[in-house]
Regions:
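Residue-level signal for alpha-helical transmembrane segments in multi-pass membrane proteins
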Residues: 5-12, 57, 61-62, 136-139, ...
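Terminal transmembrane helical anchor/hairpin motif
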Residues: 75-198
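Perimembrane helix-loop junctions in membrane proteins
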Residues: 13-16, 20, 63, 67, ...
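Secretory targeting signals
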Residues: 1-8, 39-116
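Transmembrane helix boundary and interhelical loop/hinge segments in multi-pass membrane proteins
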Residues: 7-27, 41
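Short helix-to-coil transition segments within interhelical loops
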Residues: 28-32
Length: 198
């Protein structure tokens, strides 16, 4: 749910501004383009996961509450359905979301940039990735570039599925993490400049 909401929001929020004409309104307000983009990033990478965590907490508490009334205590103990386990589960989810949000930062910046001049940024990114993989394989006669792109592309999913999300994030290596940070900053700046009409 978090990933679906993330991709839906990032793909539509900036293009929606241009379609509805609200961009001119926001430019008339005392809010810089960099702050506006930063707020959208915070919503995509922080607020959406927090909302998802509240839904998870509500579901866990509902299971616990129903269990107290209708399930034998011995069965609840066997399946670790108690407040301590629920708290631990919630904490693990928050930790996973934090690691995943860091992995999604460059993705969000790239989507924001492409979505300003393309109505289907996700399809565009998919095609670009496919072309890079094919060209890398043809030109260099190697799948190294394609393998690296796949590793980065699947990072958020791997983190989500991992029992050790931070270990999965760090496992891609410091050079790759630094490269992703540079990509994020570069596309953030490009997005701000494009939104400002520069």
């Amino acid at each position: 749910m978090t990933l679906v909401s993330f991709f839906t929001y990032t793909a539509r929020t900036l293009s929606k501004e241009r379609k509805e004409g609200s961009l001119a309104f926001w430019h008339s307000m005392p809010i810089s383009d960099s702050k506006a983009i930063a707020v959208k990033l915070v919503f995509a990478l922080v607020i959406i996961p927090i909302i998802a965590s509240f839904l998870l907490l509500f579901a866990d508490l509902t299971v616990w509450f129903v269990g107290q009334w209708f399930v034998p205590q011995s069965l609840l103990t066997d399946y670790s359905v108690n407040l301590v386990a629920l708290g631990q589960h919630y904490g693990e989810f928050i930790s996973t979301m934090a690691a995943m949000s860091l992995a999604l930062l460059p993705v969000a910046c790239i989507i924001f940039f492409i979505s300003q001049f393309n109505e289907h940024p996700l399809i565009t990114i998919f095609v670009i990735i496919l072309l890079i993989k094919i060209m890398g394989s043809i030109v260099f006669n190697s799948t190294v570039i394609g393998d690296w792109i796949s590793q980065v592309n699947n990072l958020s999913i791997n983190i989500l599925m991992s029992d050790h999300p931070w270990g999965t994030l760090m496992a891609i290596g410091s050079p790759t993490l630094m490269g992703l940070l540079i990509i994020a900053v570069t596309f953030f700046v490009l997005t701000v400049r494009f939104r400002a009409g520069k």
